[in-house]
Amino acid sequence: YGTEVHLEIENWIKDGTDPKDIKSIVAAQWIGAYISKPNIETFPEVIVYSKELGIAGTIDILMMDKKSGEYVLIDWKASKRIDKSSFNGKKGIKKESCTIDDCKYNHYALQLSLYRYILEKYYGIQVARQLVAQLKDDRVETHSMPYMKNEIITMLDSFN
């Protein structure tokens, strides 16, 4: 389901194809408020990678403020809930994650933090914010995610 929504949003941004799914329509209305600003450039479905790290991923939306040169990462999520704490206090199972609550909020924060780390280190792109845009039937709920840079570096170091 999420893949269809992503595709509809991408097609709307790239060529103006009207979305059909209710969550895609709500997302298009929300993102449209930003796209219409003359100083904002929007890039959907941006692939980032690092040969050195052997890692690649796809950023749902990368926005650039042409005045400041800063970027914002946006990741669409169709989850009903984004829990900020884990069930029964469960933590990560590796030594690098054993202090991090095992919950969707942290999973998403780590995902966006990895993308941000790759953009900043390997592409020289300055990221100002990273957001999860949670798609509801009637609105988009935004979650400003922390940059977990130290955790990402620790995890990446454990693989090398």
Model-derived features: where do they sit?
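Metal-dependent nuclease catalytic regions and adjoining charged, substrate-binding loops involved
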Residues: D101-N160
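A structural signal for short, well-ordered beta-strand segments and their strand-loop junctions
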Residues: F43, V72-D75, R129-V132
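Surface-exposed cleft-lining segments at the edges of enzyme active sites
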Residues: D15-G16, C98-C103
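Short, solvent-exposed loop/turn segments at secondary-structure junctions
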Residues: Y49, A78-R81, D137-D138
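Metal-dependent nuclease catalytic cores that hydrolyze phosphodiester bonds in DNA/RNA
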Residues: Y1-T58, M64
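Short, mixed charged/polar active-site loops
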Residues: G54-A56, G69-Y71, V140-T142
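Conserved catalytic cores of phosphodiester-cleaving nucleases, focusing on short active-site segments
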Residues: H6, I59-D65, G69-S85, G89-K95, ...
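Gram-negative outer-membrane beta-barrel domains
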Residues: K51-E52, K94-C98
